[in-house]
Amino acid sequence: MNSKILAACISALALVFDPTAPARAASPEIWLGPEELPPPGPSAVDLMDMFTPDAPWKTAAAHTQVFLLQGPFLTRATQDQLNTIVTDLKRRGIAIAVAVGVMNVPHDPPSGCGGLGNVEGYGTVQQAAKIAREIKAAGGEIKYLVMDEPLYYGHYYTQAPGKGAGCHSSIEQIAKLIKPTLDVYTQTFPNIVIGEVEPTFFIDGQANWQSDVSSWADAYRETMGKPLAFLHLDVEWPLANGVQDALAVYNAAQDLQHRNLLEKIGVIYNGSRADKSDAAWIKAARDHLLLMEGQHKLRPDHVIFESWTPNPTHAMPETDPNALTSLVDAYLNRMRN
């Protein structure tokens, strides 16, 4: 047998039988999250039109496993809107994910730092109860809960112009803060799968960040009795070191997988506020996908197409190359080829 073929076979068998190797799905799970922030935040103009039987994203919908709903949208949505969303997603067989702050600190706390509405990443048990209750009342189930950047906003964040001050809480304090909020969701939806999103640029570069990421994953498992189900990477694409930071955090996440502290990794493919048109935003998102999975050979478990910026203004139709759902179709075509 050719020595190169033999070596390749041995390497493949080593991966198959390596007990520390993380499980990898045959194909990634596709998540979709149009912008849906309440005023004055941006929202896709056709967001609610997506949840009708003839909505023009049928191919994308048939291959989307998870629809991502944002906490700020859910706290202001009417019950009728939630009924419409849940009914349509159930009909399509698409699971619901909720991305929301979970560090249990109320608005304007006595400490003067953190808090719901002051700093991203925070929430309350009351907010969690409202979201869970109304999704359940609509006949729905939250399959995935995406904690909104608890490590960054709880531990590292200082303050942004016009925003509240960060608390610089210890990792142990953050773990204690998330527990009451997460308990609300797990009590309402016992099968809920809990993970998080973190901003890679603002994690990599912090002093001792690899140790902090490991300590955070340890603290989460100790607090909740199971490892983080997933980590989604929020990449600062326009920054000079944005991609390198993302790759560093991706590698750290793989280390967590090998240590059974993390189950799956996801990458958010999007544009940025620097992209001032729908066409520019979509092109950037496609370029980022090709960069990470083509050039850098990443194989994330979750592929997430998500926007929280003014573009793209439309989610549909999927035949419009400048609409968000067209990214799902483009990804499917790439996989087939």
Model segments located where?
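Substrate-binding cleft of secreted/luminal carbohydrate-active enzymes
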Residues: 30-37, 229-240, 263-337
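Substrate-binding cleft/loops of secretory-pathway carbohydrate-active enzymes
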Residues: 202-227, 245-252, 279-294
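Acidic (Asp/Glu)-rich catalytic clusters
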Residues: 52-62, 80-97, 132-140, 182-189, ...
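Substrate-binding cleft of extracellular glycoside hydrolase catalytic domains
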Residues: 79, 84-191, 278-286
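Structural preference for beta-strand elements that scaffold enzyme active sites
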Residues: 27-33, 64-68, 93-99, 142-146, ...
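C-terminal segment of classical bacterial N-terminal signal peptides
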Residues: 15-22
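Active-site groove signature of glycoside hydrolases
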Residues: 131-168, 195-203, 226-240, 301-309
